[in-house]
Amino acid sequence: MKNAAIGAAAVPAFGCSKGGSGASAPAGEMTMRENPKTGEKVSLLGFGCMRWPSLDGRSAREGVGEIDQNAVNELVDRAIAGGVNYFDTSPAYCRGKSERATGIALSRHPREKYFIATKLSNFAPASWTREASIGIYRNSLKELRTDYIDYMLLHGVGMGGGMEEFRARYIDNGILEFLLAERKAGRIRNLGFSYHGDIRVFDYLLSKHDVYKWDFVQIQLNYLDWKHAKQINDRNTDAEYLYGELDKRGIPAVIMEPLLGGRLSNIPHTLVPEFKRREPEMSVASWAFRFAGSFPRVLTVLSGMVKMEHLEDNLRTYSPLKELTREEFAFLEEAAERMMEFNTIPCNDCKYCMPCPYSLDIPAILLHYNKCLNERMVPESRLEPGYARARRAYLVGYDRSVPKLRQASLCTGCEQCVPHCPQRIDIPKELRRIDKYVQNLKRQAALMGDVKKKFAEGGYSCVVGNGEVYTFSRPGIEDLLDLYQNRRPLLKGALVADRAVGKAAASVLAMAGVAELYAEIITRPALEMLDALRIEVSYGKVVPHIKNRAGDGMCPMEEACRDAKTPAECLKILLSKTAAK
């Protein structure tokens, strides 16, 4: 049932309305959506306050520094000036400091100018008592400098222990009844819940809609999760189903993760030109926001905008919304299908897994792996084209993205992170897998070091490493041609160190499929040829051409290949010359 088609009612009539959802918003003005209960106009762009900037230059969710209140104020001021009026926070965000920073920034504006959404974030078992949970709620009012909450959520229902945990957090302690009473008293204007994880909890709460009268529900929705959430992680549920269940009950949807933790702003590089060809002036991220905003039951789409340029980009996207056409919706569905081929880890960078007791930067480790996977920089074998270059890019990028003392090699498998992950990733398993991969890359890099050392110490003309290390002493390209003709498998995926590599030798190496080359001397044409084929090359000196043995002209083999356009053409010339001898 969870993966079944939900019918046309749940899918927006892309391109069929008179100008779409943003038709009522003049050019440059924010698209607004109407709360069906109150009639209030809510900005289609909502401000997610999970990651306020901090004074140490990092997100306050991951850094140790204090929140940069001046930066928060500037972001809030610009958002309100741009038409944003929905601000979503939680007692759990920014190490417990988001509500205070949000309250300070918002209280500088008239209360009627904005809506506050916060959550009863009683995740720790110690906070499941009625007294502790009510204390969390009352502290939210204090921190947010308000006497009422516009949008109150049960936070992360379905996470952790599923139905059993949900009942302990909200039912058995009477907290849901308390919140319903607060709504009746007007201190909560709208009551809903945010959903992650166990679909039984989602279905149960919607089955009780006649009792609880949910005013809104917050779900994860984006063009990858629309049909592929369950494929990404079998314990997740496709957004198509979640939205459809809300739509048929007339419950407004608040959208989280429209960018899937940034993954939809950093899509595989092979897809970027197709997005840019359609909308050259728009960012790749804007497509994900247009997708989420084009569903008519969506009240607002949350975005955690720590940088002003991200805020400005999102304001452009929703001022007003340019609703997706049916053809564009089909394009995004096709793009999602192609993204699924990359098999990325479903980390959304929410950082609920942090801090790690052993100081690992878990999200950074997973996101670096995903980034390299999207860029086709996760090589598995030296036989792959561009292996050595991709290996180097992965290892260098890993050290830049994740300090050595926070890398996957230090994971102890304590599993403290596992129950906190909304995507229910087996984090220790993924960290072990990544570390195994990294260690293998390092071993391969060390093999090239062995080849270069052998070459430097032995005075050889050529050294080839491929499982074992082989040495050669004849001058010129005779050894390489002999290897190509008689022992070609030795060169496939090999690591090679050579005294002098010109266009002729480069052609032999390229056609044989070597993985990596070190040359004491290399010609510019040879370097350009190997670079075009993504073969990693290091060298001592670049020269115009290889000289003959007398030193008074060009090497005959180089001369013969001077006008050859491809490695194959050059190799054909070389083989014909050697056959003629």
Regions found by a protein language model. Give the residues of each.
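Short Fe-S-cluster ligation motifs
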Residues: E375-C414
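N-terminal binding-site loop/beta-alpha segment at the start of enzyme catalytic domains
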Residues: K2-Y114, F178, K184
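C-terminal binding/interaction regions
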Residues: L527-A580
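Acidic (Asp/Glu)-rich catalytic clusters
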Residues: P36-K41, G103-K113, L141-T146, L206-Y212, ...
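Short, acidic/polar
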Residues: G65-A79, T129-E143, G197-L206, V284-F289
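Conserved mixed alpha/beta catalytic, RNA-binding, or beta-rich assembly cores of soluble enzyme
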Residues: L447-E520, K547-M554
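Active-site groove signature of glycoside hydrolases
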Residues: E143-E165
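Beta/alpha (TIM)-barrel catalytic core signal, keyed to glycine-rich beta->alpha loops juxtaposed to Asp/Glu
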Residues: E29, V157-L367, K371-A390, P419, ...
